[in-house]
Amino acid sequence: MRYSSYEMKKNRFTYGLALGALGVVFGDIGTSPLYALKVTLSGIPINQFNILGVLSLIFWSLIIVVSFKYLMIIFRADNDGEGGILALLALMKHKSTKYQPLFYIVAIFGAGLLLGDGMLTPAISVVSAVEGLGTLSDKLYPYVLPIASVILVLLFSLQAKGTARIGYLFGPLILIWFITIAILGILQIVEHPVVLQAINPYYAIAFLVDEGLRGYFLLGGIFLVVTGGEALFADIGHFGKNPIRFSWFFIALPCLLLNYFGQGANLIVRPEEISNPFFMIAPPWFYLPLIIIATVATVIASQAVISATFSLTKQAVLLGLCPKIPIVQTSMLHSGQIYVPQINFILFIGTMAFCLAFKTSDNLAHAYGIAVNLEMLLVDAMVAYAAVSIWRWSTFNVIFLFGLFLLIDLAFLGANTHKFITGGWVPIVLAFVIAFIMYSWRYGLEYLRDNFYMNKEDISKILKQLQYKSLNQLPGVSAIFITDVYDKSGGSFLHFLKLNRSVPENVLIVNYIVDNIPYVHYSQRYEIVCLDEKVCKLVIHYGFMETINIPRSLEKACNKNILPFKFNVDTATFMVEIPNIMASKEKRSLSFYWQEKLFAFLMRNYSANLNIEFYKLPYNRTIAIGTYCIL
């Protein structure tokens, strides 16, 4: 669900926005109590000293990493109300510096890490919830994985339907989840209030000193309580800063702390219940309802991660970082409701592979977190640069503050390194693959623009050379020539002239530009240049969160009398150019021959039909003009 940009820009607060944020933003971090404390305490003696030390680390991690770093500092780095690593990249593009190529690499690698996280989060969340069946009977344990698999299959198969009809329920359902886990925690804390001493950071420091190297590596388990914190920044554009802050400080944070402390209080007197400390703090009669509530909460958390991945993909496509893969709008009312079939399939295969390979939430936890940790580090570095170059903070303040953040994240990363060999390598390798594909695509488009289109003569000169007015006219015919991002010279129109030696009565050459802001105001939408009496070049500006719809934009332009001539968009013919890219061993355009082959493959498979779909052109009135390019 997306709310109006006016609300976002004014940071308007409503309880509806806060409730919506609760359902989408905090699902991931909100379901961490299912497994985080169990994983952290496994393998060490379950005694009061260790429990207080771990609880103190959890408390201060949530305060420093989420409450202070993300909600107070990182939130400042929004791009016109939009958050996330690609929005941050677009913000950096406002400052043209020598570091811009580095920012591209950092951002696309971070995007790849988030895609890897999108595979692991549904797996560990749903499996950990269904594992609650073991509290009902040991005989139900063999059914945990099949039931979790069925839930995940249904979750991914229903993505094409969208969440418009049930999305409004996410907030109230997650609110029920938070209230439930808070009450369960309070019941235990009242009986054993000694756990409240863990608020004192002394216990965290004493625990790390006493446990030494083993205690340090337990930070990998502690990090699980802040996974999902990155979603707070990514979802600024959906709900705004103030509703997210309100939901965190008044609902999510207190409820999470109460539950973690409640689990700890129970373990102090019943250390044998470490096998499933979350479900064991509930009375036996509440096991089944709690399993149902937990499963619903984890499905919502998984849905939020999947939707965020779709949104990230759309940003990458519009910013020209990846091919124009099919993006389906699942709601006519909310532009944020989208479905990306190919990404959904990749996430599904990855999630099911993790489930079947690791089988339990404990095993999944040994692979989970390192990708999120790396992504947080990358965001820290980019925001630190923004603080110096855009916010004009003093170098000393930036070094002190972000030095602290980097030190904490590096400490977590060091503790998470062992996860690389226990499955954490999968999302990291996937991130490298995705980053390389994005890099090859971006570099290939730039090469195509600079070597095949940039050097073309000005269209007005070519029109004179061809004696445009003496060419055969097609009276009553209006043609719209669409040029891609790499083509600023009207290649489709020029190829049409050379092939036909005749011209439509009205010619409009359309080029679109995705600006480095999420939404473009109507007053800045159009730029028009008249090349001849009946030939115009129109540039349409979009934001990186908008849906490109050329016919709709042209219809609005006609209604506002922006164009010097009249034509009917509903009867006009659209022309698109489809380049056929071939890799050549004789000359080297990109870094490697197989990189050229990859770019050529992507261009061949994501140009013709997908260009027509991407621009929302009518198939029955669109003509594709082929051209041949050898790299």
UniProtKB/Swiss-Prot annotation:
Chain's role: Transport of potassium into the cell. Likely operates as a K(+):H(+) symporter.
Membrane topology recorded in Swiss-Prot or TrEMBL: Multi-pass membrane protein
Protein name: Probable potassium transport system protein Kup 1
Gene for this chain: kup1
GO molecular-function term, one example from the UniProt record: potassium ion transmembrane transporter activity
Location relative to the cell: Cell inner membrane
Catalytic activity: K(+)(in) + H(+)(in) = K(+)(out) + H(+)(out)
UniProt keyword Ion transport present: yes
HAMAP family, per database record: Kup (MF_01522)
Gene Ontology CC: one annotated term: plasma membrane
Species assigned in the record: Legionella pneumophila (strain Corby)
Main location group: membrane
Transmembrane segments: 17-37, 55-75, 101-121, 140-160, 166-186, 217-237, 249-269, 277-297, 338-358, 370-390, 395-415, 420-440
InterPro entries from the UniProt entry: K+_transporter (IPR003855), K_trans_C (IPR053952), K_trans_N (IPR053951), Kup (IPR023051)
Family: Belongs to the HAK/KUP transporter (TC 2.A.72) family.
Protein keywords: Cell inner membrane, Cell membrane, Ion transport, Membrane, Potassium, Potassium transport, Symport, Transmembrane, Transmembrane helix, Transport
PANTHER family in the record: LOW AFFINITY POTASSIUM TRANSPORT SYSTEM PROTEIN KUP, OSMOTIC STRESS POTASSIUM TRANSPORTER
